[in-house]
Amino acid sequence: MTEFVVEFGKIVPPMPDGRLQGPAFARNHDAIWTALAPFLRDATGDVLEVGSGTGEHVSEFARRAPRLVWWPSDVYPPHLASIEAWRRHSGLANLRAPQRIDLADLDWTWRRDEQSGGALTAVLCINVLHIAPWRVAQSLIAGAARQLRERGRLFVYGPFKRDGAHTAPSNEAFDATLRAENPDWGLRDVDDLAALGQDAGLPLADIMPMPANNLVLVFARALRQD
């Protein structure tokens, strides 16, 4: 079992149909969608969410962007069950069944179906990198670069450091708590992630400030040179 799993069912008990709820969803989904909407509201193609957790975000965003096909994923079986429960509850035709994707595997892939359009329009990652080893950040960016179409986007939401420093005392305290729980966890620096993206052909294109001292990092797939 991958060691960076956070078990949402321990925070809020599951609903009778198996749906789990994460406390952060109610606080952040509107703000995250506001950041994503200019890119995704009217887009077409396929969007993969990695580390979907409870499945609440992907269900909500699939409702708001019906022209896209949304593909949730996670590594933890109870989360996969919750994602499927949210999918069934939503009744959305553009929300696919969850896939098991382990970002600790550097060669992870998205499994297409006969209706998929090929390369991904976007990859979405919400609140994962600070509760995961550094290799997960490496794997996320390298895998997104492999599987995004030209001009496709990787969106990464969460708390980050900038220029080697925390952006708020609350983030510094949170980082210390995470590292005390697991030395491989902690807030990642934007510059380090930007370097990964540059090396992978997925340069950092935008940094979007968000409420509660969070950011959305937008990486854009470079045009392939033939």
Predicted regions, residues:
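Class I SAM-dependent methyltransferase SAM/SAH-binding core
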Residues: 48, 60-108
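Conserved Class I S-adenosyl-L-methionine
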Residues: 167-191
